[in-house]
Structure formats: structure tokens, C-alpha cells
């Protein structure tokens, strides 16, 4: 059964990327919810031991994907993904040891990245939206930072999770630029967002299915 779910995820992923390339908005909207649905089903079937904290991440991402289809629900979609990042953080921290000194330098690096993204998009945001962006990007960077600490602590499959987290940061940074800095041209922005988001979620799920 897990092979079937993975094949379905791959098929919906290819379909979504094609819809983005062809700029077919209706096709994108119909196809999008099936990405996280099939990935979540695959994780539950493939994991040696299903981690409920982690499984809540793809579930909330599915909710976020559905909400973001509708333009008026952007904040609600962002809130769902904010919750997904918190679930990922909680799941990653079960495998983390802070005995490695790398975490201090890594924390500084993530702060610089968040600061750069916020500085870039600030001119296109109202104050309230900017405050929400600060909170969201802090959670996103904390998720990726936690994935790095997990990799430093346990190695192995945690490398996939960390790589996925970096792609997630890239994907959400592209969304921020697309929504709030339209003066910066991004070729095929929907395609680039999904081309980073899809492998991000897949790598995170693959790694966590082995780590437990």
C-alpha cells in the first residue's frame, strides 16, 4: 500500500508542476490538496512507528494548501502552516542533543536569513502583515534550525529532513517575494514555489519515516 501512495504522490506532483508551468489556475487548485494527502497516507503506511506530532505537520500543511487556494484566506493558510512548523519542531526535538556547539553559530545564521527576507519584503507590507510575517518566518527558521540540530545530533536520515527544511525556507521566501515584492520579477513563480515545496515535504517525510 505504501508504494501505491508514493506513486500517487509522484503523479500528483508531476501534475501540479505541469499545471504551474502551463499557468492553469483551475488545474492547480483541483490537484493541490492531493499532494499532502497522499504524502501523509504514505508516511502513515511507511513509518516504522508513526509519530503523531510529526503526522500533524503534513495534515496542517494539507489544510494550509486548501486555504491558500482562495485569495481571501491567505492569513488562515499561513496560520495552518505556522502550526505545521510547530509540529515539525516538536517532532525534531525528540532526537536533538544540545551538546554540539554548532547550534550557536547556526542560530546566528538563521537570524541573518530571516532578517534579510524581512528587510526585502517589508516595503510591500502593511504593519500588521509585517508583524505576522515576523512571527511566521521565525517559526519557519526555527523549524529548519531544529532540523539542523537533529542532523548534528543523530546524522543518517536526518540529513534528508534538514535538506527538506532548507527547501521549505526557499519555497516560503519565494512566496513572500511573489506576494509582497511584485516589482522583483520572478519567472514562473508558482512553478518555482512548488518545485521547492514538493521535494521539501517529501524529504522531510522520508527522513522522519526512518527516524521515527
Question: What kind of region is each of these model predictions?
Answer:
Residues 1-212:
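Polytopic alpha-helical membrane-helix bundles and their juxtamembrane interface segments
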Amino acid at each position: 500500500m505504501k508504494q501505491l501512495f508514493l506513486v500517487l504522490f509522484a503523479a500528483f506532483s508531476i501534475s501540479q508542476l505541469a499545471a504551474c508551468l502551463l499557468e492553469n489556475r483551475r488545474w492547480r487548485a483541483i490537484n493541490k490538496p492531493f499532494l499532502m494527502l497522499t504524502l501523509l497516507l504514505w508516511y502513515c503506511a511507511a513509518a516504522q512507528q508513526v509519530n503523531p506530532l510529526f503526522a500533524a505537520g503534513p495534515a496542517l500543511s494539507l489544510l494550509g494548501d486548501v486555504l491558500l487556494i482562495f485569495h481571501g484566506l491567505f492569513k488562515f493558510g499561513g496560520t495552518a502552516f505556522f502550526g505545521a512548523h510547530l509540529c515539525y519542531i516538536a517532532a525534531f526535538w525528540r532526537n536533538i542533543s544540545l551538546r554540539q556547539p554548532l547550534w550557536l553559530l547556526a542560530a546566528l545564521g538563521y537570524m541573518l536569513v530571516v532578517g534579510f527576507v524581512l528587510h526585502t519584503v517589508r516595503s510591500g507590507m502593511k504593519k500588521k502583515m509585517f508583524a505576522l510575517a515576523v512571527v511566521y518566518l521565525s517559526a519557519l527558521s526555527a523549524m529548519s534550525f531544529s532540523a539542523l540540530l537533529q542532523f548534528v545530533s543523530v546524522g543518517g536520515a536526518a540529513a534528508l529532513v534538514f535538506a527538506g527544511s532548507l527547501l521549505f525556507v526557499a519555497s516560503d521566501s519565494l512566496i513572500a517575494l511573489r506576494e509582497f515584492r511584485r516589482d522583483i520579477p520572478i519567472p514562473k513563480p508558482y512553478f518555482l514555489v512548488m518545485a521547492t515545496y514538493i521535494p521539501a515535504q517529501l524529504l522531510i517525510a522520508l527522513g522522519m519515516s526512518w527516524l521515527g
